[in-house]
Amino acid sequence: MTGFFSKYSRFGETSEVASDLERLNFRYRHVIERNQNLLAGKTVLDIASHDGRFTFAALRGAGAKFVVGIEARASLVEKVKKTFTEYEVAAATYQFITGDVFEEVAKIERGTIDTALVLGFLYHTARQYELISSLSRIGVMNIIVDSNVIKTDKPYILLKVEGTQNDSQIWDATRPKVLSSIPSALALELLLQEFGYSTTRIEPEGDIPSSAKDYERKARVTIVGIKN
């Protein structure tokens, strides 16, 4: 098996969430490599950075200048630190913040972030509008979204109740279940457009491994929003 994450196989062990290396390699090609122009030499914000897989990919693979990762679960941040030490990532090129995404984004100084990675997050929140508004407010020019979606051609967001106990679920410090939602692809596009981002859907190319067939089924989409 070849691919970016095959060279850094620790990421197949630091999380049980979508950590199949074939899927990670596909997502690297599809999300990171195809948007390298929005990452190379940029300061990047990684929303819900999990075990640091795409923070690392942005730095080591795409050539980002600096990446800030925000992750609510301290146990995952501890794993990131060990992984980055093992792979000798320069400490001056990244920062991980343990905290609530919405609270921490609000603290970021305007104009300090070029590109935001919002990967695997917008179907674990009922606050999509608020997040994109906050990213726009702090001056983020490029937003790369990768999300599960409901399959409809309407701009719908489906509310749901989601557990909070597993790393694959929405985070909440005090409640075992909270309100969450899953958007449609068109809803995501309209949310980005509302704040002045022109949108492009990134369609999957090449061989899609069995562990990433959700992209082929259009149950998951990648959308890039850019402000000119």
Predicted features and spans:
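A short SAM/SAH-binding and catalytic strip from SAM-dependent methyltransferases
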Residues: 115-127
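Short alpha-helix
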Residues: 178-196
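Class I SAM-dependent methyltransferase SAM/SAH-binding core
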Residues: 65-92
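A short glycine-rich, Lys/Arg-flanked "PGG" loop and its adjoining helix->strand segment in the class I
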Residues: 129-142, 149
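Conserved SAM-binding loop of SAM-dependent methyltransferases across substrates and taxa
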Residues: 51-63
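Conserved alpha-helix/loop element of class I SAM-dependent methyltransferases that forms part
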Residues: 22-40, 57
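Conserved class I S-adenosyl-L-methionine
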Residues: 42-50, 145-168
